[in-house]
């Protein structure tokens, strides 16, 4: 379905292997925005292996304006047992600050919604930090709702290893 060009010259396209440095830059910029730069473990090597290797675990779309990458979205498919359909999960979306308010994020979200429909997904979902009010308002303007009855849980690092070794 993509690439797609808008009247304003914005192009959405699927990322390819040569875009790995761009993807890593977006990940680092997002981490800085979210005050989590110290948490980034991604490298060009890990991105190559996990996004463009033998088993790609996720996909990336890039938004380009005047041949410059200004936004990205990384997503993958999950599955809902209740609706018995795949879902589309948006792991990250980020638009560089100088390009916000121009409809770039909205166009990426519309594209992902259309992709979810084309793939017969039962839902399109993502997480957002509670302090990130600008993003929460943006998502609500698209028709998204917060899932107040749900809490995100995670096991990682040493606890993940400990849990696995206890099997």
At which residue positions do the language-model features occur?
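Conserved beta-strand in the GNAT
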Residues: 62, 68-77
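Conserved GNAT-fold acetyl-CoA-binding loop/helix
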Residues: 24-50
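A short helix-loop-beta-strand connector motif used in the catalytic cores of GNAT acetyltransferases and
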Residues: 51-62
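A short beta-loop-alpha structural element at the N-terminal edge
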Residues: 11-23
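Conserved active-site alpha-helix within GNAT-family acetyltransferase domains
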Residues: 106, 118, 130-149
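Conserved GNAT acetyl-CoA-binding A-motif
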Residues: 117-127
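Conserved beta-strand-loop-alpha-helix junction that forms the acyl-donor binding cleft
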Residues: 126-135, 154-157
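Conserved acetyl-CoA-binding loop-helix of GNAT-fold acetyltransferases
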Residues: 95, 101-114, 141
């Amino acid at each position: 379905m993509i690439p797609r060009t808008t009247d304003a010259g914005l192009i959405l396209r699927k990322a390819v292997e040569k875009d790995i440095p761009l993807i890593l830059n977006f990940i680092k910029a997002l981490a800085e925005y979210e005050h989590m730069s110290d948490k980034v473990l991604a490298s060009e090597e890990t991105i190559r292996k996990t996004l463009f290797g033998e088993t790609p675990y996720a996909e990336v779309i890039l938004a380009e304006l005047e041949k410059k990458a200004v936004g990205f979205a990384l997503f993958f498919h999950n599955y809902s047992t209740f609706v018995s359909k795949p879902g589309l999960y948006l792991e990250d979306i980020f638009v560089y600050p100088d390009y916000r308010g121009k409809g770039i994020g909205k166009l990426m979200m519309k594209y992902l919604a259309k992709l979810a429909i084309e793939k017969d997904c039962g839902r399109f979902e993502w997480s957002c930090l509670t302090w990130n009010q600008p993003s929460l308002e943006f998502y609500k303007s698209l028709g998204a709702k917060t899932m107040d009855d749900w809490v995100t849980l995670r096991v990682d690092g040493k606890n993940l290893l400990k849990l696995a070794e206890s099997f």
